[in-house]
Amino acid sequence: MELGAWRSILYIAFLFAITRHAFCKAVNLVHSPEGEEFENILSSVSATVEKKEVNNKLIMPTANRDNQGVREELLVSSFKERKLLNTNSANLRLNSIGSYEMIDFKQINSEFFLSHRQHGFVLFIDSKKKPRQSFYTDSATSIVQLSKKYRNKIKFKSVDCASSLEKCEEIGINSFPSLVYYNNAGQKKVFTAHTPYEVLSKHADLITELDETDGKVYPQSIIRLEEFKNLKANEPVFFLYLHDYGSTPEDFDSLRIFARYLVGFAPLYRTDDEKVIKTLNVTRLPHLVAIRHGVAFSYSERSVSAMRNTFQLIKWASLLKYPLVPELTPAVVENLDSDSYLAIALINPTSQVKASKAISTVQEIGLKWTLKLREVERKQLLTAREKWWDHLRMLKQKGYDDVAFLAAEYSLPLPKNKKVTFVWVNSLQWKTWISHTFHIDPMGPSRFVLMDPSRMFYWDSSAKGLPLTLDDSSLILDTTFRVLAITGEGLPHEFSIPRGYVYLSEIKQYSSLILISLWISLILFVSFLNRRLILHYSFESVHQLKTLTRKFIYSSLLKQD
């Protein structure tokens, strides 16, 4: 092989190395720690969610945190925290060995825990790991106190993950010790060594209260109109069961199971007060509503069997048990619809006072959106109803005999609006993902971004080109209506580029180098081809050209003759 061919091969290898380096750089930019976790969260609509939560205790107290109590998210978030908590304490086992019944890991997924009637705490430990931090003893004390106080009221069991660590991680146990409450609906809530005893105690009190009402009507107390108004003003989320004298014990049994699912999120009340029923415009009983920041969300099913279907109730309340604008966590994402847009509020937590105020503002924006959307949908329903009546009049004018039958076949043209969920995230935790995806300074003022997770499009400005900040809620609402095409108006002028293109643009500094390498390789490859072959084709071309020229001259001379 000639020297020129070897040079061509070397230049091609050099070009391949440069291209591979640029591609790896782009992959590293996409899969940064924060970006990978948040991408899993937004894609959870269709992908697997990482088994970790956001630790709000390390950031700031959220709005109405005092009222939420056990609704605080106190789970482990970072690798550093996991490393600190991946310990086991002999004191914990000695002090609480009498309160916890050791069970095998296989029993976790058995019918025992999947049964509707079994519930209680399960302590996950790892006997192979030794204590590493002195604070662990204090953290374990809260677990020990809980088991001593409620050992005769709540079931306590223990699982050693030493022999099945991977299986424990699959069910979301990433730190030890972890105390998990399994309710009788198959759901679980994880508490770690970060969780204070007060939070554990409040959670256990609610469980004990439910246990004491077995066989009785639950909820036991009936609220009246004044109490209902106080709850609307003070409770961010609560559920209300409206009934009359016709309710049976079976109805309240399903409510008791439903209440266990709501433990730690929202309380459940009941009423037969006609004033409350009239206030909520309810015409058929029994009826179940969720009140979120004063706005009622009704359970659409009205039949008695549907009201007793616990799993159907749990599915309906999966997202309604959170505040109107919750923090985006894996638990929230699991309950989102796959076709739902996301209105993400990027909250800057550097100032605790400003952050709390921003979260309150986000809740107000979510409330305005809900009320405005209901107003628009009411108009859409009235328009659809008018179209149906026009169709009925048209049938009568044509003289059809079976007008009622034909009208029944014509379905009411109900509006099919796109869904959107308002959430907020901590811009400090996700600063890398925010800066790479949206090209927004995460440490800047808090702002809004509308996102379509299915196509990975986003909108960060209004139709006038103004950024979507929390100061102007009207711009946020107007842009949301435009993006969802609910009001029929056009999209914002500042349309964002696809997320995939955003990632590709991160390697634009390598584009000139890649182009130069391509041109050099192409020139060298052509120049070092077999010279004999090039000369052969060149001589053959010259010979053909001469032949054609002679033929042209002879033909022209013959024409002259």
From Swiss-Prot:
High-level lineage: Eukaryota, Fungi, Dikarya, Ascomycota, Taphrinomycotina
Record field: transmembrane: 510-530
Cytoplasmic face of the membrane: 531-561
Main location class: endoplasmic reticulum
Signal sequence coordinates: 1-24
Residues on Lumenal side: 25-509
Name assigned to this protein: Uncharacterized protein C1840.08c
Subcellular location(s) per record: Endoplasmic reticulum membrane; Golgi apparatus membrane
GO CC field: endoplasmic reticulum; endoplasmic reticulum membrane; Golgi apparatus; Golgi membrane
Keyword field: Endoplasmic reticulum, Golgi apparatus, Membrane, Signal, Transmembrane, Transmembrane helix
Membrane topology: Single-pass membrane protein
GO molecular function, one term: protein disulfide isomerase activity
GO biological process: ERAD pathway
